């Protein structure tokens, strides 16, 4: 079975991954069929670059993405776009829905970032209050 998975590269403590199509029996960093993109988890924010047409091809011929790769592909909107095409929508409808999806996804990311900043500020305030008392 062909799997779409991550192949580790980079140096020690600085991982960088290639997204590859590989035989499921091959080792993680072993033989692969095709490079489909890359993922850099150490960048802030992390970066994902995929070749959408090739990933779509491999998914259509039955390749199974691993859980991590599935979430990375889902984050790019490719799975949503493939689902819209499968439902038989016109190109203009797909483009409109994808634009709405991108806006909603940007709002979600901004909301998560704001929540993270609020938690960080609350923690700093609590530490400052604790050090002022003690």
Swiss-Prot record:
- Give the Gene Ontology MF terms in alphabetical order: structural constituent of ribosome
Q: Where is this region: Disordered?
A: 115-134
Q: Which PROSITE patterns match?
A: RIBOSOMAL_S16
The organism's superkingdom is given as Bacteria
Keywords assigned by UniProt, alphabetized: Ribonucleoprotein, Ribosomal protein
Keyword Ribonucleoprotein listed? yes
- What's the family? Belongs to the bacterial ribosomal protein bS16 family.
Protein name stated in the entry: Small ribosomal subunit protein bS16
Protein species of origin: Chlorobaculum tepidum (strain ATCC 49652 / DSM 12025 / NBRC 103806 / TLS)
Q: What is the lineage of its organism?
A: Bacteria, Pseudomonadati, Chlorobiota, Chlorobiia, Chlorobiales
């Amino acid at each position: 079975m062909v799997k779409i998975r991550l192949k580790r590269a980079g140096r020690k403590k600085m991982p960088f991954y290639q997204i590859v199509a590989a035989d499921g029996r091959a080792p993680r960093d072993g033989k692969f069929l095709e490079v489909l993109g890359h993922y850099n988890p150490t960048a802030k924010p992390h970066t994902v670059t995929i070749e959408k047409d090739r990933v779509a091809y491999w998914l259509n011929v039955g390749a199974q993405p691993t859980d991590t790769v599935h979430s990375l592909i889902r984050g790019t909107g490719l799975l949503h776009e493939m689902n819209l095409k499968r439902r038989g929508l016109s190109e203009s409808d797909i483009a409109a829905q994808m634009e709405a999806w991108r806006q909603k996804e940007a709002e979600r990311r901004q909301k998560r970032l704001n929540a993270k900043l609020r938690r960080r500020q609350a923690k700093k305030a609590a530490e400052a209050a604790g050090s002022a008392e003690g």
